[in-house]
Amino acid sequence: MGVFPKENPINVIIAVWPWGSYLGDEGMKNGIRVKISSFSRPHINATMVRAKTVANYANSLLAKREALKDGYDEAALLDTDGYVAEGSGENIFMVRNGKIKTPPLTAILEGITLDSILQLAVDRGYTVAQRKVTLEEWRSGVESGEIV
């Protein structure tokens, strides 16, 4: 077989089920505790980070495990330059001063949810920006209550 399975068949499975609140109803009601993970989001050129493949979730799995072990509800991963990238299983959005910010596609997994949220925000009159977010900017906004 080797690392190039040219002649192997490709099998696809699609599973669908009701999901509910990703971090639970309590998390939605009371908020969650987030740990900045020691694991980072892989660099965009390191592997196929734009594809939702099982192997690309290794860092997210390790980050979530680390957060839970340390008493947190969720993990946030930084990119390889130290900027806020994403949660272990979700995109991160900052709502500050009436503007919605999210990390650029060079640091996060592009997907339907991200596109939908950004489009809905624009449709509702929000200013939206995809740009690098420093950890200090994120922390100061959370601590002051400006970021929700």
Question: Where do the language-model regions lie?
Answer:
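Helix-start/capping segments and mature chain N-termini
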Residues: 2-148
